[in-house]
Amino acid sequence: YMIAHGRRVVVTAAHVVRNESVMAIDGRDGETVVGQVAFIDHGIDIAFIVVPEIETRTAVRYRPQRRYDERLVGTTLTYTGFPSHHDLLTIRGYVSSIEKEHIVTNMFGWFGSSGSGVFDQQGRYLGIVSGIDVGTMGFGVRIPLESIVWVAPVSKLDHEMVKIRIITSVVPQTLNAFPGARAPRRGGLRD
């Protein structure tokens, strides 16, 4: 939950939003707001949702890390999210490599981590948790590698287009404004 270009936004994974135009966003203590999907990049796997104020959350300033090269390797990272059945968790790790248009990290992740915001120690936003790596054992058996987390980098976005889409988006004021808003999965269970 951030303030970007004078608006409140939630940034998540594009595969969470799919092709929806509005989403229900959960705060804490039962609070729910509805946001308009302002920008989606399925190739990078990032979506921006413009939301009204979430009273049970504190918005941080959107400060994107625009670097995307091997100088990121070794950078200490933190992400916060609602993986699996857990409430808010904070996980730390570091950048291992830059590969296939993503930032590959060494930090714990599991199903339900997708969309969690990833920040460096200076508070710059690197992107979102996009997925965990999958390795193969003999006979084609695939297993999740929970310590290798793929981050969709915000540095690969068209920042001017993101700004235009955020500024021109409608901010829904009530949950009833969009009665069919789909809620993203939270805590590994459908809302």
Give, region by region, the residue ranges found by the protein language model.
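Catalytic-histidine neighborhood of serine endopeptidases
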Residues: I3-I54, L72-V73, G131-I132
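Terminal peptide-recognition signature
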Residues: R8, T12, G35, I49, ...
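Residue "hotspots" at secondary-structure boundaries inside conserved domains
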Residues: H15, Y68-E70, G117
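Acidic surface patches and DE-rich sequence motifs
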Residues: G27, P83, D120
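Short beta-strand segments
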Residues: E31-V33, T58, I91, W150
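C-terminal cap/linker of serine protease catalytic domains
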Residues: T56-T58, Y125, V129-D191
